Each structure stands twice: as C-alpha cells, then as structure tokens.
Swiss-Prot record:
Biased composition (Basic and acidic residues): 36-51
Protein name as annotated: Uncharacterized protein DDB_G0284127
Family annotation (InterPro entries): BORCS6, BORCS6_C
Source species of the chain: Dictyostelium discoideum (Social amoeba)
Coiled-coil stretches noted in the UniProt entry, renumbered to this chain: 119-150
Length: 462
C-alpha cells in the first residue's frame, strides 16, 4: 500500500511538472506576442506623432501671422492635400491590427476648430475694412458738402467795388459764418465714427493675438505629447482644446464688457457735446441777428452818404466837362459823334450801380438769413423729435413696468382670495358639523320630553 501511494505521489508530481512547463511555454509565447504587438503599436504611434507634428508645424507657419491670414485665403489645393493626408492615414491605420479611429476623429475636430478660428479672424478683418471704408466715404461726403457751401458763399458774395468796400466785407463775414456751423457738426460726426471704429479694430487685434496664442499653445502641447501613449495624447488634446475655448470665451466676454462701457461713455460725452453745441449755436444766432441789424443800418447810412456825394461830384464835374468839350471842338478838323462813356456813362452808371448793388446785397442777406433759419428749424425739429422719441420710450418702459406691477399685484390678490376661500370652506365644514350635532341634540330632547310625558300620564292613571 505504501508503494502504491508513493507511486501515485510521483505521478502527481510529474503531471504538475508537465503543467508547469506548459504554463511556462504559454507565458513565453504570450510575452513574445505582446512584445510584437507593442512594437507595432509603438511604430504606428511614432508615425502618427510625426505626421501630427508636421501638420501642426505647417498650420503654425501658415496661420501664425495675421498678414498671412489676410493675404493667403484657403485654397482648394490645401483642402485637397489635407483630405489626401487624412485618407492616407486612415488607410494605413485600417491595414494594421490596431484601430486608431478615435485619434483621427480628434484630429478632425481639432482641424475644424482651427478652421473656425481662421474664419472668425477673417470676419473681424472684413468688418474692420468695412468700417474704414464707411469712415472714408463720410469724409468724402463732408468735403463735398464743404465745397458746395463755399461755392454758394462765393456766389452770394457781391462783386468788389471802391464805393461799397465796407458793405461787401460785412456781407462776406456774415455769409462765411454758416459753413462753420456745418463743419463743426460734420467733424463731430467723423470723430464719433472714428471712435466707434477704433474699439472694433482693437478688439479684432486682440482676438487675433488670443487666437495666435491658442495655436502656439496647441502646437507646443502636441510637440511635448509625442513622448506619451495614445491615451495621454487624447486627454491632453481634449484638455488643451477646452482650456483654449475657455480662455477665448473669457477674453471675448471681457472685450464685450469693455466695448459696452466705452460705448456708454461715448454716448454720454456726445450728449453733453450736443447740449453745449445747442447753447453755443443759439448764442451765435442771437449775436448774428443783432450784428446784421446793426450792419444793415450802417449800410443804409453809408449808401445815403455815398449817393449825396456822387450827386455833388456830378454837379461839379458837368461845367468842367462842357468847357473841355467846347475847347476840344475847334481843334478837331473832323466832327465825330460824342462818345457814350465820355458824356453819359459816369453819372448814369453810378446811380444804377448803387441801386443794383443795394438790391444784390439785400437779396444776399435775405438768402443767408433764410439758410440760417432753415438750419435752425431743422436742428430744432430734430432735437424735438429725439426728445419726443426718448419720452415715448420712457413712457413705454413706465407703462410696461406699471402693467407688470399691476399683474403681480393682481396675482398676489388672487392668491390671497383663494386662501381666504379655503379658510371659509373649512369654517363652513365646522358650522355644518355643529348644525348636525344641534339636530341630534334636539331629537334627543324631543324623545326625552315624550318619555317624561308618558311617565306623567302613567303616574296620573295610577
């Protein structure tokens, strides 16, 4: 029996040794297979990382500077090359035993985000260009307007003459005031336009800088992530993309807040400037009216004086002219008809000239006054329209607030009424229960009365 037990033990030990050898062989085979798989994965990972680095360097070189973004639009060849590269990568990955579809999807997402950033940059640049073109057009319109006003002033100004030098200078000074009013308003509009365009351009530049920083950080992250495995690359790329999006959103929010604050300050400054301009314009108009009245009186006095002096000079010159004609007649061998300029030009044309100049000056003054009055009425009408619109908007806001308050008050009142109704319902329930109890008590009292009445009858009978 002992020999049989020892043989069994030996056989069991031998079988255990065989099993151990098989397990060792299997482990060796598994380790060899794992090594080959790891080598293949490392080789494919290195290929992918090299392709990623080359693509990111290409994009970084192409889109790092804003001038290259504006000058070089995305062509169809670049898109085709990118598509071919993506197709080649997918083909190589599918041929291997390792499935790298997740990496490819992440690459596509990353490229689409870069493309979106590039499109945003281009849109900002186009908006800045449009605003600059609008500002240039406004400048051109203002220059044309100033040239038209100067032409009108030159047409309205009377011709220079020796006798009416003072009047002509006064009229020119009175007529040259109107362009100043128009030029101030136009310059203020141009300043406001330039101020409105400047924050947009600065914001576009800031957005460009932030986008360039995000692209540089992503390229650095991809270059450093070549040392890690596939899972580390995926997590790093996701975190970097999320961080870049958060940073860009925060920067955009800060820029929007700054732009809103600047816009509010500009509006307040413009309102103050407009109020000051209105006051100054009213003062200037009043001063102009008083000065014009004084000038008209002075011009009339000067015209009367000049007319009297001219008449006296004509009366004094007539006998001298007659003597000169008498002296010149015997000297001339051939009698010629008298010249018009020698006999009738000076006395007749002086009176007519003064009258025409007076009419021209009066018409010019009336035209200038009408232009000033028209501008004043237009300005007043515009100011009244703006005030009315502001008042209407304020009344609308007030009415909306009142309606909202009324609705809230009515809702609260309805709630209180509903609560009171519930309370009344509860009270009525208690009253009904009391009424029922009273009925039962009455019934019992009636029964008790009947019993007593019956007892009394029996007592009487007995």
């Amino acid at each position: 029996m002992e020999d049989s037990n020892t043989n069994k033990d030996i056989n069991t030990n031998i079988t255990n040794d065989d099993d151990d050898n098989k397990n060792i062989n299997n482990n060796n085979n598994n380790t060899e297979e794992d090594v080959t798989v790891e080598r293949i994965l490392e080789r494919k990972q290195k290929e992918r990382e090299s392709k990623l680095a080359s693509m990111m360097s290409h994009y970084h070189q192409k889109y790092s500077s804003p001038s290259s973004l504006l000058s070089s639009p995305i062509s169809s060849n670049d898109n085709n090359n990118n598509n071919n590269n993506n197709n080649n990568e997918s083909f190589d990955i599918n041929n291997t035993s390792y499935n790298g579809q997740d990496d490819q999807d992440e690459m596509d997402d990353f490229e689409s985000e870069e493309y979106k950033q590039i499109l945003l940059k281009r849109k900002a640049a186009l908006a800045a260009k449009k605003k600059e073109s609008l500002a240039e057009q406004m400048k051109k319109y203002n220059q044309q307007y100033d040239s038209i006003i100067s032409g009108v002033n030159t047409i309205l100004s009377p011709p220079p003459s020796s006798t009416t030098s003072n009047s002509s200078t006064s009229n020119n000074s009175s007529l040259n005031v109107s362009p100043v009013l128009f030029s101030t308003t136009s310059s203020s509009k141009l300043q406001s336009l330039n101020n409105n365009t400047s924050p947009s351009t600065s914001s576009s530049n800031l957005i460009d800088s932030t986008n360039v920083q995000t692209t540089s950080t992503t390229t650095a992250a991809t270059s450093t992530s070549t040392q890690f495995t596939n899972t580390n690359i995926n997590t790093n790329s996701n975190t970097l993309i999320e961080n870049s999006l958060k940073i860009s959103n925060e920067n955009n929010n800060e820029l929007n807040e700054q732009l809103q604050q600047q816009f509010i300050l500009q509006q307040e400054q413009l309102r103050e400037q407009e109020e000051l301009k209105e006051k100054l314009q009213q003062q200037e108009i009043e001063r102009m009216q008083t000065e014009r009245k004084e000038r008209e009186l002075q011009q009339q006095k000067e015209l009367i004086k000049n007319a009297t002096l001219d008449n006296q000079q004509q009366q004094q010159q007539q006998p001298q002219l007659e003597l000169q004609q008498q002296q010149s007649q015997p000297q001339q061998p051939i009698l010629l008809p008298p010249l018009i300029f020698e006999t009738n030009d000076i006395p007749l044309l002086t009176n007519v000239g003064f009258a025409t100049l007076k009419n021209i000056e009066c018409n010019a003054i009336k035209c200038s006054e009408e232009v000033v009055l028209l501008t004043k009425t237009l300005h007043q009408s515009l100011s009244t329209i703006t005030k009315i619109s502001i008042e209407l908007f304020e009344t609308f806001n007030g009415s909306t607030e009142v309606t909202c308050n009324a609705i809230g008050y009515s809702v609260n009142e309805t709630k209180t009424m509903i609560d009171k109704c519930f309370e009344l319902n509860n009270h009525t329930k208690s009253v009904i229960s009391l009424h029922q109890k009273i009925k039962t008590v009455r019934d019992q009292l009636d029964k008790f009365d009947q019993i007593i009445h019956n007892a009394i009858k029996q007592m009487n009978k007995t």
